[in-house]
């Protein structure tokens, strides 16, 4: 990953420090909408991989495992796998009233819960808007879902 800079178009580029990385995420949610139009979700499944080193050759057949239920206590759990609430990566959707609303990811679902939403996210930069590494590149081709 490249060094993180901030560039919003209104000021000079500023070096922030740290490294920016590509990320691939598969998130399964169980969503519902309340009477006020707020959209809520439980995290059913999580498969997130940060690509923290250069991969010079094309990789065929790469797999990202999806883990079900509450994974926060697992030894391999990383902070970037957390629920998306109050983070720069919060998700939004159009509710039944036609408004763009933030999705409130309230907790972890039981591992046997049936999801009703699949999110697949490919990011060349895993930081918030206007922060990133100049030169980060992520090539994606032929995505396949295996059930």
Regions from the PLM with identified roles:
Residues 3, 29, 67-69, 146:
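Solvent-exposed residues in well-ordered beta-strands and their adjoining turns
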Residues 1-34:
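Extracellular-facing segments of soluble proteins and assemblies that are Gly/Ser/Thr-biased and enriched
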Residues 23-27, 61-65, 119-123:
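One-face residue pattern on beta-strands with alternating periodicity enriched for small/polar residues
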Residues 20-24, 60, 134-141:
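Residues that flank catalytic or metal-binding motifs in active/ligand-binding sites
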Residues 111-114, 126-147:
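Extracellular carbohydrate recognition
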Residues 33-112, 133:
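Extracellular carbohydrate recognition and processing domains
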Residues 17-20, 110-115:
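Short helix-terminating capping/connector loops at secondary-structure junctions
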């Amino acid at each position: 990953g490249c060094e993180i800079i901030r560039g919003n178009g209104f000021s000079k580029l500023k070096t922030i420090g740290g490294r920016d990385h590509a990320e691939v995420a598969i998130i399964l949610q169980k969503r519902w909408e309340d009477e006020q139009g707020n959209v809520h979700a439980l995290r059913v499944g999580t498969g997130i991989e940060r690509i923290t080193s250069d991969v010079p050759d094309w990789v065929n057949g790469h797999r990202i495992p999806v883990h079900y239920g509450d994974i926060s206590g697992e030894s391999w759990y990383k902070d970037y796998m957390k629920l998306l609430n109050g983070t720069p990566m919060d998700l939004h959707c159009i509710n039944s009233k036609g408004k763009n609303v933030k999705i409130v990811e309230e907790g972890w679902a039981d591992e046997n819960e049936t999801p009703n939403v699949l999110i697949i996210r490919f990011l060349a930069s895993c930081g918030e808007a206007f922060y990133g590494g100049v030169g980060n590149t992520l090539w994606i081709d032929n995505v396949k879902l295996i059930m």
